[in-house]
């Protein structure tokens, strides 16, 4: 499966998460996944909550609409973003490469 996949009007992302980073940032392709760094620690779901908040702002979608499909307790995650209003250049480039 590619790192970024368009399914109708939705996006499915395979993510490699780096918690406890110095800033929130979309890094790019890493090991066939989109690498994202976030500042939250991986304790009691803080990293997942922070990731969803970051993706919500980045893709301009309500946080409650973003679905964590796989990887709740892992650095490797699969996330579905319904009807993104904005697609960052890093993600758009990966989307173009996979189609």
From Swiss-Prot:
One of its GO terms (cellular component) is cytoplasm. Signal peptide: none annotated. It comes from the Bacteria. InterPro entries: DUF167, YggU-like_sf. Belongs to the UPF0235 family. HAMAP family: UPF0235. PANTHER family: UPF0235 PROTEIN C15ORF40. NCBIfam families: DUF167 family protein, PRK05090.1. This is UPF0235 protein HSM_1819. The lineage of its organism: Bacteria, Pseudomonadati, Pseudomonadota, Gammaproteobacteria, Pasteurellales.
